[in-house]
């Protein structure tokens, strides 16, 4: 089995090395004969040293000039040669336990893909409440967080990848399409819960409660209009790092 690990990255020089180290450590601890992998970092038009740091760490670097996370993930998938695709965000860290669970799911042959619960350190009460609400929703509806989504490469290509009309929440649409694809073939799409993915809480540190909750409310009240307009998604796209 050959696994392609794809990391979209826009101005991630502070965190990309940490992310890549977590991946190489997880790969090393879960090595087994017959398993191969590749790591692809998609430089999503960065203006910092992200691409050079990724190359120095041994990753293949692909350039995507249009700053859009779904488009960046698709660009990485277009270069991938794996039977399975693992998308993980540059501000997240894989852990060996989670990676082992992913490999077991792949070996089991009963799933089209999976997502994972996530953990963030140092959240204020309102942000932790928001996270817990999302986690409950994710598990109930089997919607993957964008921070980590894993799927068969043939399924990904059959459903058309990430929706490039959306600038955020495209992982929910992909989760739904993968569930449908899998259901037709007797396969499931699940959310792993034993070893949560560690992801950064920088949005909470960089944006006020008013900014974050306002962004969430706009998405809830006017989802299509908001998610298709990059200018209305400042928490994702204004470049604060």
Segments (PLM) and residue ranges:
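Cell-envelope/extracellular polymer assembly enzymes that use nucleotide-activated donors
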Residues: 2-4, 38, 173
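Short, well-formed alpha-helical segments that are part of the catalytic scaffolds
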Residues: 12-31
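Acidic helix N-cap motif at the loop->helix transition within catalytic regions
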Residues: 14-18, 47-57
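A conserved acidic beta->alpha catalytic loop
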Residues: 22, 43-51, 92
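Glycine-rich, basic loop-to-helix element that forms the pyrophosphate-binding segment
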Residues: 64-80
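Short aromatic/hydrophobic "clamp" motif used to bind/position activated sugar donors
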Residues: 85
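Conserved donor NDP-sugar-binding/catalytic core segment of glycosyltransferases
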Residues: 96-126
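A short, conserved alpha-helix in the catalytic core of glycosyltransferases
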Residues: 155-160, 165-186
């Amino acid at each position: 089995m050959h696994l392609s690990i794809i990391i979209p990255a826009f101005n991630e020089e502070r965190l990309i090395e940490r992310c890549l180290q977590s991946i190489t450590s997880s790969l090393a601890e879960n090595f087994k004969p017959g398993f191969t992998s590749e790591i692809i970092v998609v430089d999503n038009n960065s203006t910092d040293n992200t691409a050079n740091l990724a190359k120095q760490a041994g990753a293949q670097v692909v350039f995507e000039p249009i700053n859009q996370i779904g488009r960046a993930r698709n660009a990485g998938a277009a270069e991938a040669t794996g039977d399975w695709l693992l998308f993980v965000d540059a501000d997240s860290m894989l852990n060996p336990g989670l990676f082992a669970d992913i490999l077991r799911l792949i070996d089991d042959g009963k799933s089209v893909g999976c997502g994972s619960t996530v953990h963030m350190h140092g959240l204020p009460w309102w942000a932790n409440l928001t996270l817990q609400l999302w986690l409950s929703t994710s598990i109930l509806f089997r919607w993957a967080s964008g921070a980590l989504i894993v799927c068969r490469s043939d399924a990904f290509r059959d459903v058309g990848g990430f929706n490039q009309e959306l600038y955020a929440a495209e992982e929910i649409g992909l989760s739904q399409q993968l569930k449908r694809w899998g259901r037709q073939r007797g396969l499931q799409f699940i959310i792993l819960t034993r070893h949560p993915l560690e992801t950064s809480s920088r949005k909470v540190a960089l944006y006020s409660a008013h900014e974050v909750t306002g962004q969430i409310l706009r998405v809830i009240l006017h989802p299509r209009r908001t998610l298709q307009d990059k200018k209305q998604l400042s928490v994702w796209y204004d470049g604060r790092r």
